[in-house]
Amino acid sequence: MNDKLRMVLKKRYESEIEDAKYKIQSFNENNIIIPEHIDITGEVDKLLLKIAEAEDKLAVMRLHYDQKEAKSTEYKIL
């Protein structure tokens, strides 16, 4: 994976995390209730899932594609 693509994906996942965190914070601080989304716990659960998925993707990128893909070909057999 080239550096530009890696940087764009990293920023994308980081922005997804920040967006979800901001929405959770808004629910919490402002007691926002959206008429079509009455299930606050369900909405927060969905936002937490978005955070978890984005963090997982960042972790996979770090594991397999950081350091110019040097480690992506190294697999250990247990």
Which ranges hold each PLM region?
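Extended, charge-rich alpha-helical interface modules
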Residues: 1-78
